[in-house]
Amino acid sequence: MLGFKDKIIESHIELYGDPDSKTNNQYSFFFFSKIEFKENDIFQIYAKTAESRIRAGWLFPVSVLGSREHDFWENPHFSVYAKIGGGILTSYTGDDLSEDTHILILKDATIAEYDIYVENTAVSLLKHGYYPIVNGAKFHNSLCTIDNNETKNISVEKHPEISSHIPYIPKLVQEFLPKTTDPLSRFISIYQVYELLMEKYFHYKIDEYRALRATIGTIREKISDLSSEKKLIQGVFSHCKLRNNIDENERALAKNLFGTDKDDAYYKGLQLQSLIYDIRNAIIHNYHKYELSDLMRDIAERMEIILFETLENSQVSALLAKAPAPQPYNSR
């Protein structure tokens, strides 16, 4: 009996002829898992830079390589990549492909010219529900979706500062999130990013005061102002101009979690920075008090969406990459 990959290859040959693997060395490919999808989930990938938006490749379910039951069957641009995909499948020796597998094919010349690689664009795909396949593990976030009825394109942006300045973040998005299914573990690992950002912000502010040649007394006073985690996360949100208003789903999550422990004024004035911090406190200090086991998946899924939004923020990248050069202390 033919396995999944062999069935696709057999059908592919009937549709496109024998695969030509000679052109494969001009392209890079990556496999992703996405559990809930439609066969029509075929997207052109565009590399988004400060100056332009360039078509870099295609992303589609592996299953469409052996099918004509989709909208792109007669698209000449897709056909080129479908034939390349057939060659990739023919030479691929792994046994980790399944009906949930999607393939991203990028033209090497384009990604080299614009420095667009999976390693520095992972967030742009994760937020749509495409997780790297890690040791066969698969995770599905019901909030990470993209509707092919609304768009046929996915734009990817590079975030090199994130990879080079905080190694934990690429490890989180490329390895930990794809294979970890426990929502509590996911939340804790996601919140670590905000703790890292708070640490970065703290040192950024201290270096800023030093650059201004502030006195030690002034610096001590400023350190005291930055001593609490609540003030630090407020500082991160303000400095990076992150979204602070909450949507109705986030407000509903807060009400489901805290109930009557918080009054109407709290829910009415709730900001995102406070929601994140308060959820963290509830989990760390009062896990036994709230019905967190029933809410943890919703909490983790929404925190993941917020995390991706944070990592795509240009001010976050700037915070990670830049800080004033240290100056000698003025002891007077």
Enumerate the language-model features and the residues they cover.
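Charged, non-catalytic interaction/linker regions at domain boundaries
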Residues: 1-182, 196, 297-301, 305-332
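Amphipathic, oligomerization/interface secondary-structure segments
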Residues: 152-332
